[in-house]
Amino acid sequence: MLNREVVYAAPGKDESAIERFSEEIEKHNASSEQITNVSMDMSPAYIKGASNHFRNADITFDKFHVIKLLNEAIDEIRRTETAVNPCLKGSRYIWLKNPEHLTVRQSNALKTLSKENRKLSKAYQMKLTLQDIYRTTHDYHVADVGFQKWLSWAVRSRLGPIKRFAKMFKSHYDGILQYFKSHLTAGFSEGTNSRIQELKRMSKGFRNINYFISMIYLGATDLVLPSYT
C-alpha cells in the first residue's frame, strides 16, 4: 500500500479473477505467499478467492463497507416506519449522515424526528456508537471488547434489520476485527474505481477489454512515463 498503484486489472468479479492475479504474480519473480494482508468487502467470491489463493494473507473487511451495511439496515427501518409515520418522508439522508455533516436545518429535523420515532433514534445511536469504536479505538483487544458489547446491544435491540446486521457482523467477525491490526481499508481502491469510471465515461465505452485495461494502468495510477526530446 506504500506506492498505492494498480498492479493488476482483469475482467470479472468472481474467484477466478483473484486466481489469475495470483498466477500473474508468479510470472514476476514473486509468490502469492508473499501477500500477507488483503482488504476487501464481504463478497463471498472475494473471500473464497483470497482464502484459496493467498493462504498467508489475513483478510480485513473494509470498515466503510461495514458502516454501509449498517446504514442499509437503518434505511430499511426508516422505510418501514415511514408507512406508519408520514413525517419521516424525505428524511433518508438525515439518518445516513453523521451529525457533524448535517446542516442546521437537518440537525433540528433530526432532533425532532428522533423524539417522534424511538426505533430510528435507537438505530441511529447504535450506528454512531459503532463508528466511535472505529474512530477512537487503537488497540485490538479494546476493540474486541467494544464490538462484543455493541453486538450484545444489537441482538437485544428488537430491531429486525439491526439484528440481521449483527448476525452478519458475527459471521465475519475475525475479518472485521482484523482492521485494528492491519489498519487497512479499501479507500484507495474505491478512489481508483471512481477514476476508472471517469475513464469509461470519457471514452464513451470500450469495445476492446485489453485496450480498456491498458487505459486503467495509464490513467488510474500515478505512473510516470519517460519523456523523449
What annotation goes with each model-predicted range?
Residues S16-E24:
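Structural motif
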Residues N3-E5, S22, H28-T60, F64-K68, ...:
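Acidic/histidine-rich catalytic cores and adjacent linkers
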Residues L2-S16:
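Glycine-rich phosphate-binding "P-loop"
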Residues V66-P86:
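Short alpha-helix plus adjacent loop in nuclease-associated cores
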